[in-house]
């Protein structure tokens, strides 16, 4: 199913937007005055009508307005800016006209595939420019000419410095998952890229969470942005059941996880740890106990990560142990259970993690392992998202089945 084509409409009706006054709602894609070839791609991709964020943001972005769009996972955010980029580019000019920066390689690759699918009838060129891949291939593709580049900040900045990614025709910069991008790790690289862009470049910021420091940051490179925002207390996904299990000692988490495996009939599950070392340790422990699991983190070679993702997408592996590299926008339909073996060290990542389950209105369950040291973090998450996380009931298997 295409992202957004199975959006929970009932949940959407209850969603309250805090949005700039000039934003109008376009209830159909036809009413947005999009190119005929793009409309064909949208319908072929599985969309029938725009989601709440799409119906508000696409026309504003196509008008050339700097835009801050905030909507929860699974509401069609990726397609919002993909459709907008495809509308404004001129495919007769084989130069990069739109640039998307994402915090992870997987997300950048996924965006490329969405752009190519939506632009199927437009003869569009789109390249994923990401670290961990062959530089020579990047250079060849960029020298050939790409209308849209989706990439990670480091590799994109490198290709611009080497003058293979030509910036003079760029008219739109999209920062996807901006909260993560603008965290300290990527801030300087984004500034590096931004310095090379034409002064009139339109900036679009898209994210599920927009902490105040991120909004403050956007003032540096946005002019009078139009805002399309969901109130923060609406951000926890509808249809998700959130539980915690109180565990006395860190050492007992593993036994608790094994007990859960015995009682749950799981379609697909993701288990999150905070460090790469913990992912490797837990993967080894689970395999020693004869549980079949796969694992992924940022230290792995890109080819290996791609292969693991593909296996998981196709349902060949059922349980994936990962760090937050997986938590940002990766679109796997079947995930019905998320276990936070470690609570996220950054509370903004909580929604990205649990947003993995129950996408597009599917039921999903999130289970948080909580030691006495974690109680304060759990309460902080509850307050931040205005949500309630209950102790896990005995019949949790029935809720997932």
Curated annotation (Swiss-Prot):
Name of the protein: ATP-dependent RNA helicase FAL1
Alphabetized PROSITE patterns for the sequence: DEAD_ATP_HELICASE, HELICASE_ATP_BIND_1, HELICASE_CTER, Q_MOTIF
Free-text function comment from the UniProt entry: ATP-dependent RNA helicase involved in 40S ribosomal subunit biogenesis. Required for the processing and cleavage of 35S pre-rRNA at sites A0, A1, and A2, leading to mature 18S rRNA.
Organism: Pyricularia oryzae (strain 70-15 / ATCC MYA-4617 / FGSC 8958)
Gene that produces this protein: FAL1
EC number: 3.6.4.13
Gene3D superfamilies linked to this entry: P-loop containing nucleotide triphosphate hydrolases (3.40.50.300)
Top EC class of this enzyme: hydrolase
Residues in coiled coil: none
């Amino acid at each position: 199913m295409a992202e957004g084509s199975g959006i929970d409409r009932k949940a959407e009706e209850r969603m309250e937007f805090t949005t700039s006054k000039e934003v109008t709602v376009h209830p159909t894609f036809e009413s947005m005055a999009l190119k005929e070839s793009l409309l064909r791609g949208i319908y072929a991709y599985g969309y029938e009508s725009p989601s709440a964020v799409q119906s508000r943001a696409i026309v504003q972005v196509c008008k050339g307005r700097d835009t801050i769009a905030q909507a929860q996972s699974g509401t069609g955010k990726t397609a919002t800016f993909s459709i907008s980029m495809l509308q404004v580019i001129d495919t007769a000019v084989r130069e990069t006209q739109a640039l998307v920066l994402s915090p992870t390689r997987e997300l950048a690759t996924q965006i490329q595939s969405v752009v190519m699918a939506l632009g199927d009838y437009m003869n569009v060129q789109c390249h994923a420019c990401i670290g961990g891949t062959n530089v020579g291939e990047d250079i060849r593709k960029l020298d050939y000419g790409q209308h849209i580049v989706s990439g990670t900040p480091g590799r994109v900045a490198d290709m611009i410095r080497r003058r293979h990614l030509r910036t003079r025709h760029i008219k739109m910069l999209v920062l996807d998952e901006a909260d993560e991008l603008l965290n300290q790790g990527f801030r300087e690289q984004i500034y590096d890229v931004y310095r090379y862009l034409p002064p009139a470049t339109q900036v679009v910021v898209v994210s599920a969470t927009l902490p105040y420091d991120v909004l403050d940051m956007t003032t540096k490179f946005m002019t009078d942005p139009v805002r399309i925002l969901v109130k923060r207390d609406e951000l926890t996904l509808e249809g998700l059941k959130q539980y915690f299990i109180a565990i006395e000692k860190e050492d007992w988490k593993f036994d608790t996880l094994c007990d859960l495996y015995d009682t749950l009939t799981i379609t697909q599950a993701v288990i999150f740890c905070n460090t790469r070392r913990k992912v490797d340790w837990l993967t080894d422990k689970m395999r020693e106990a004869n549980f079949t699991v796969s694992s992924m983190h940022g230290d792995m070679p890109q080819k290996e990560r791609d292969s693991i993702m593909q296996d998981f997408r196709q349902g060949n592996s059922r349980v994936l142990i990962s760090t937050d590299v997986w938590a940002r926008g990766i679109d796997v339909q079947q995930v019905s259970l998320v276990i936070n073996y470690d609570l996220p060290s950054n509370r903004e990542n909580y929604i990205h993690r649990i947003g993995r389950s129950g996408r597009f209105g599917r039921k999903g369950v999130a289970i948080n392992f909580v030691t006495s040291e974690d109680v304060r973090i759990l309460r902080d998450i509850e307050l931040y998202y205005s949500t309630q996380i209950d102790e896990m009931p005995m019949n949790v298997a029935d809720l997932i089945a």
